[in-house]
Each structure stands twice: as structure tokens, then as C-alpha cells.
Amino acid sequence: MPAVAITGIRQTGKTTLLREEPNLQGRRYVTFDDFAQLEAARQNPEDLLSGDDPLTIDEAQKCPELFTALKREIDRRRRPGRFLLSGSVNLLLLKNMSETLAGRAVYLNLHPFHRREILGQTGSAPFLPSLFKALAPSGAPRESPFSGGAILSSGGPHLQPRLRVDAPPPPIAPHELLKGGMPSVCLGEVEDPSIWFRSFEQTYLERDLRGLSQVADLIAFRRVMQMAALRTGQILKQSELARDAQLNSMTTGRYLDLLETSFVIARLPAYLNNRTSRLIKSPKLLFTDVGIAAHLAGVKDLDPASDEPLRGYLFETFVAQNLAGILSAHWPEARLHFWNVQGRHEVDFVIEDGRDSIALEIKAGTRWGEGDLAPLRTFLASSKRCRAGILVHNGQDAVHLGERLWALPMGLVLS
């Protein structure tokens, strides 16, 4: 494509990537964080885009006037990779910009760091895509998805064989959720993460948001952010959120749209391939970074003994953050959903690839019982093309529980 757009929530490292990636050296670089360069582009976008040298434009969404001129220049002279754009908003959700670049740009999302990156595990293939390929549609392994693949022992909580996993990744520690995946925080570049998160929030509200839309009441918008953080990992009930934020539903919906456009939240669609009228069709609300969600929700302690009511939802948000990064980089044809039968069963994540899928139920604790498997059993019974239903727990045992049913460590699933 003549244009490549790299987008993502602010502070994920887009500018660092554009400036320091060796393969991008030698390109002409402008940033619309520089007011002089922004004003020059507004006055004469054609002049900025002319020339044969490859051009990188950082924070491109700040100059909407650029995109019509960009379309004309691409149509005049198409050359792969000629323009590289970055932005802290989802250009696909901005109608005028997405329509202008239709058929002329490819979009890439730079997600917050996932655990594989933080632990330096990116030299190996991720586990989940490998598991999906290793399982036949019936759920029977074509080849072992585990290192070694041998049975360690019979027994365990369900008298099923445990599988050997060589050097399994460690369980997820509470501090991993509180830090999240923003590079400066999760890589230990800041001494006090709480100060960084407060600065992020202030900059987002006072600069990024104002550049995206006219929001008259920033206090009300911040209240919606906080109410949304308290609901991460849960089905979105907009009228209830609006009531708690003391706003009408229309204003609340507009604010949620702005949060989604700027990559602060995502709305996970429901999986609707099952033949039942009782399926929940409303999306699930998820923050794209679990650390930001915990900060906005005021969560300070996620130890099991703390009895934090959001603990399970924040673990689910952490898994979603990791899945988003892994699927984007290694399994782009996969689609992420959740499944809910009204008033009865919910499966936290369904990864769909063509007609086949894998279902994941997230358990924040290390212990689990038969009751935790009920949603997966129901989903497997209604979805014959699901290759595996996996109870993802924060322990270390990998257990095969029967046809298409597994209990696997969260550290392994996200490795």
C-alpha cells in the first residue's frame, strides 16, 4: 500500500518506533506535536506531501486537512510505503479520514506490551496459535502442543493426566496487573507508577481529548472514564453507566465513543454463531491497558487476601490485553469474542478462525472445581467446531480433562 498507518493509545512507543527502527531510517520526518509544522501543513498540505523521498508523519490525525491532499498525491503517484502515518486515535473510526484513505492504506495497531515482550519471550512462537494448529477440529491433538508432551502422572483434582510442560512461565503476579503494559511503567523506567498514571490521565484529558473533540465538561468525562474502569471485563450496560455518571445516555455514549476512538477502551463483540435466542448481543467493555483500568478504578492491592471485587475482572482485562497483542502480531486472521447465554453461562473469550474456535474461561485463582467448567462444557456442546475449551487458571498444572477440555496455566496460555 502507498500509506501505512500505525495507531494506538498514547505512550505505547509509536514515536520511538518511527524514530529508532533501523528499517525506517532515512525517511523525512515531521511531527504535528510541533505547532509550526502543524500550521504549515494546514496552510499548504500539498507542499508537505510533494517530493519523492519517503515521508513519516507523526500524530497525523491532528491535521484533518492533510488527508484529502494525501489522497490526491497517492492517486497521482502510487508507491508502496511512500507515506508512513502515526496517530493516537483510531483512524478507521474517523469517517472522513478512513473514507479518504480507503484502498490506499494499511492499518497497524501498536498495542501495550504483552507478557511475552516484557519477559523477553518473543524469540519463540506463541502458545495459543500453536495449540490451535496442533489440534484437529475434533479436539484431538495432531501433535503435542506441549514441550515434551509426556504424561507426568495420573491424578490431580479430576483424576485426569497432567501434562509435562518444560520450564513453564511463572504465574501472573499482582504487580503485573497494576503496572499494565505501558512501556515506561512495565519496563521499570519510572520510579512511581502512580505518578505516571496521573500524568497520563491529565495529559489525555487536557490535550489529546481536546484535539479529538469538543468536550465542554472534562469533569463529567473523567467520571465516565472512572465508571467505565469499574466495569472493565463486564457486559456494557450503557444506561446503568450513564446513571452512575449522572449523565444522559446520549452524552455517555458519545464519551464512550471517544474513549474507544483514542484506544483507551475496546468493545468486545459477542460470539453469535450458536443457535439460541438467549444469547447476549451487547458488547463487553474492556480497557486496552489493565494498569490504566486499575488506576482509574482506584485499585491498589490485588493480592488474593485483599478481597478486591474487581480482581477477577482485572485478570480478564490483563488476558484480553495480552491476547490483543498476540493475535495482532501472530494470528491476524483470528477474531476475538465472548459468549454469554442470558442468565446462565458465560465464556470469557472465544477466538474464532474461520469456522473453528478455541474457548477460554479465565480463573484468577490457582484452585478450580467442576463448577468452573460448566460454561465451557455448555459451549462445547453447542459448538462442535470448537477445537478446545480451556479453563485458564493462575496455577501451574496443565491437565487434560477429556475430549476438547483442558485446564492450563495462565502463564503458559499467554506465553
Predicted regions and their residues:
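Accessory nucleic acid-recognition modules appended to NTPase machines
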Residues: 186-357
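Conserved lysine of the Walker
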Residues: 14
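Interdomain motor-coupling "hinge/lid" segment immediately C-terminal to the ATP-binding subdomain
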Residues: 90, 96-230, 234
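Hydrophobic anchor at the beta1->P-loop junction of P-loop NTPases
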Residues: 6
